[in-house]
Amino acid sequence: PVIYGGTGNGPAFIERTADIHQAVQDIIASKTFDNGVVSAAEQSVVVDSCIAAEVRLEFEASGAYFMTEEEAERLGKLFYFKDGSANPELAGKAAEDLARWAKIDVPAGTKVLLAEQKYVSENNPYSKEKLCPVLSYFIEDDWMHACEKCIELLLSERHGHTLVIHSKDPDVIHQFAIKKPVGRMLVNTPAVYGSMGATTNLFPAMTLGSGSAGQGITSDNVSPMNLIYVRKVGYGVRRIEDLGMGTPADASGCRGAAADEDSLRKLQRLLEDALASINNQL
């Protein structure tokens, strides 16, 4: 079987209770690691509208450049060829080099380029994975709209990988955790470092599974446990004749004595039907 790491198109949401300075520093540190070639790196930033102005100022003070609509369009045309394939020449290139190719005049020392967007679409290069220090930037009215925007971004290109949220509100964090189609959700940490276990307690790994949602076999950080061969031995604990006599299996390993009686009756009926079908064929 193939252990599939998957395409990352992970957004980072900066919620109104976040430590804005730390959130921006985390995102820039993550997106500039290896100039953005790590799939787990942030691809988009989604910001709560009430703090958008402060977040923008923090980005600009930290070496980020917000492109004009025209500049973003020029750079966006370089990401993909006419046949839809990605341009490998842009992968891992520094922000200043990318700006030079797109004829964008940026301040010396620019670390990251940002393109403000409103919509997610299949033909928008800023809705996809960008293996370079370029981020799309969305402003949403509240965390609920931001939640939907993050889902849009995740579903736009093989979901299942990674999501980041910067917030101090446990209820918002919980809502994001239970709703997003991702293998890992990171809280108040850089995506690259957090996903590989450097700044979190996730298993240290460079191959990050995306699970069945991302067309893989695991959503774990791939470890030696995904690669070793484990033989399991199962001893017989009941006879076939017992299956039709109301003797349920010992479920102590998963549900224990609190197993639902109705579920057991349904299981018994299914087993009885299966045995009857087998006997009719003998």
Regions found by a protein language model. Name each.
Residues 1-121:
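ALDH superfamily catalytic-core signature
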Residues 1, 11-14, 23, 28, ...:
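Intrinsic structural disorder
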